[in-house]
Regions:
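Transmembrane helical cores of multi-pass secondary ion antiporters/exchangers
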Residues: 1-434, 516-536, 540-548
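Cytosolic C-terminal regulatory domains/tails of membrane transporters and channels
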Residues: 428-548
Length: 548
């Protein structure tokens, strides 16, 4: 029962944290609020203790979030920015592990070289979810955010694989060689991507088979979709591949496979609402768990530091600042180098970095905040070596990693709004143009389809529909579509007409809903009739609201 009540309390806290941030007279990013509430609940006064199992955390929370990110990631843009993304997610991770690893070994007494590499490895993954939480959706220009999100999807795997190598060397179960590490990394990465693709493809085939046999019940399909992401992760991990990349690949494959495009309307609507709820809860749980671990990490690390003659307690806090500053310097230097290389050697097909200003490079550097993967990775470091001795400097690694996570979030909260203040984003203007173009293009196609249907119905003797009625209905529908096409020339008027029509329809639907409840209250209709008609109205209203 204790676990059950703990889950209920955490879910309640996640739900209320959003309300708290809106009620406060000053603005606090939601992730920081959830971390603060978690730390407060775990303080000895309240005593909510949650045992953090890194392996369970990686299986339970990370696959759904990465699957959802992969699902939402536009594949075309991801491929177009492939050089930039892999330059950050692979090459920069290697540079970070080597460079920051030697720095940690040099500035932090008591941390041997291999554990220093392990700490640098867990500090290399960035967290796009935390970034969106501290700056808000759409605040960072799309050209930057798209690359940062792609980087975050990929560098989780590269960082954890680097950690695995470092821990294996420290445990004495592996002799590190560059060639061996490269082959192992390629095997883990490519195998994970293939595993995610195959599992997702099999899911798509099975959904088509079930639909053919009448098994297109939305609830069943959503549950199977939810199980898909765990299946891709667990199968890949069982084989020895990257489960993280498998979850990402499965999410991206779903968008390209056409499964959602051909799914029933009810399934698409329910899937979107279900995933929105799960993302909110899982994201909140991640930051809440981070906060719940902080008091224990702080107290145990300080006690261990006091007992360690080689460590000055106050220097641990200084080391956090120095390590974070070094991470930002390496990141900025790498971005600046890629910009120069693009301008010098890739003039025919330059990378996106080639046109970035120094301010945009700074934004991308500070935006590389650390989050859940870093904490889970560092806590997964074993307590003991095979010979029974304690893993070298484990408490220091955990303390420094947790400190860098928090410090990166605080710096992001303060610095990013300042850096973004003078950045004029034209993303919304471009999006409005694309929307108008798409609406007009789809209206043209729709008009042709209606005209063909009118001709088919008029020639169908079985339907036996009056030609005048056919013409009247088709003309009314085509008239609405014509206004959308004409909107290319008079955009504001067209958008105003669509907005007014939507508002009128919503008002009508809501009044109909109220009347249905009245009819049920006066016992003029049964509860079954009420539920059926309410379901129809909900679908229509969802379509109108989705179109806003």
């Amino acid at each position: 029962m204790e676990i059950f009540f703990t889950i209920l309390i955490m879910t309640l806290v996640v739900s209320l944290s959003g309300v708290v941030t809106r009620v406060l007279p000053f603005q606090v990013p939601l992730p920081l609020m959830q971390i603060a509430i978690g730390a407060l609940l775990a303080w000895p006064t309240f005593g909510l203790h949650v045992e953090f199992d890194p392996e369970l955390f990686l299986v339970l929370f990370i696959p759904p979030l990465l699957f959802a990110d992969g699902w939402k990631t536009p594949t075309r843009e991801f491929i177009e920015h492939g050089r930039e993304i892999f330059g950050l997610a692979l090459a920069l991770v290697v540079v970070t592990v080597v460079g920051i690893g030697f720095l940690i070994y040099w500035i932090v007494p008591g941390i041997p070289l291999v554990p220093a590499f392990a700490l640098a490895a867990v500090l290399s993954p960035t967290d796009a979810v935390a970034l969106s939480g501290i700056v808000g959706e759409g605040r960072i220009p799309k050209k930057i955010m798209g690359i940062l999100q792609g980087e975050a999807l990929m560098n989780d795997a590269s960082g954890l694989v680097s950690l695995k190598f470092a821990v294996a060397v420290a445990m004495g179960t592996m002799v590190f060689t560059i060639g061996g590490a490269t082959v192992e990394f390629l095997k883990v990465a490519i195998g994970g991507i293939l595993a995610g693709f195959v599992v997702s493809w099999l899911y798509g085939r099975s959904m088509r088979f079930l639909s053919r046999w009448g098994g297109d019940e939305p609830a069943t399909q959503i549950v199977l979709l939810f199980l898909l992401l765990f299946a891709s992760y667990l199968i890949a991990e069982h084989i020895g591949f990257s489960g993280i990349l498998a979850a990402v690949a499965a999410g991206m494959t779903i968008t390209r496979s056409g499964v959602m495009r051909t799914a029933p309307l009810a399934m698409r609507l329910r899937a979107n609402s279900t995933w929105a709820m799960l993302e909110f809860v899982f994201n909140g749980m991640v930051f809440l768990l981070l906060g719940l671990q902080l008091p224990d990490i702080l107290s145990s690390s300080l006690v261990a530091a006091e007992a360690d003659p080689n460590v000055e307690t106050w220097m641990l806090f200084t080391d956090i600042v120095l390590i974070y500053a070094a991470l930002m310097l390496v990141r900025f230097g790498w971005l600046w180098t890629m910009r120069k290389l693009s301008q010098r050697f890739l003039k025919k097909k330059p990378m996106e970095f080639g046109s970035w200003t120094t301010r945009e490079l700074l934004i991308s550097s500070v935006a590389g905040v650390r989050g859940a993967i870093t904490l889970a990775g560092v806590l997964s470091i074993p307590l003991l070596l095979p010979d029974g001795n304690v893993f070298p400097a484990r408490y220091e690694l955990i303390f420094l990693a947790a400190g860098v996570i928090l410090f990166s979030l605080f710096v992001g909260v303060i610095a990013l709004p300042i850096l973004l203040r003078r950045i004029e984003s034209t993303d919304h203007v471009q999006q409005r143009k694309e929307e108008r173009l798409a609406r007009a293009a789809t209206a043209d196609v729709a008009i042709v389809a209606i005209q063909k249907m009118e001709e088919r119905l008029a020639a169908d003797t079985k339907e036996n529909i009056d030609n005048q009625l056919l013409t009247e209905v088709s003309s009314r529908v085509i008239g609405n579509l014509r206004r959308r096409v004409d909107g290319r020339n008079d955009v504001e008027t067209s958008m105003l007409e669509e907005s007014l029509e939507r508002r009128f329809r919503l008002a009508a639907l809501r009044s109909e809903r109220g009347e249905l409840y009245h009819l049920r209250a006066t016992r003029q209709i049964s509860n079954e009739t009420l539920q059926k008609l309410l379901h129809d109205l909900d679908l229509l209203e969802a379509l109108l609201i989705e179109d806003q």
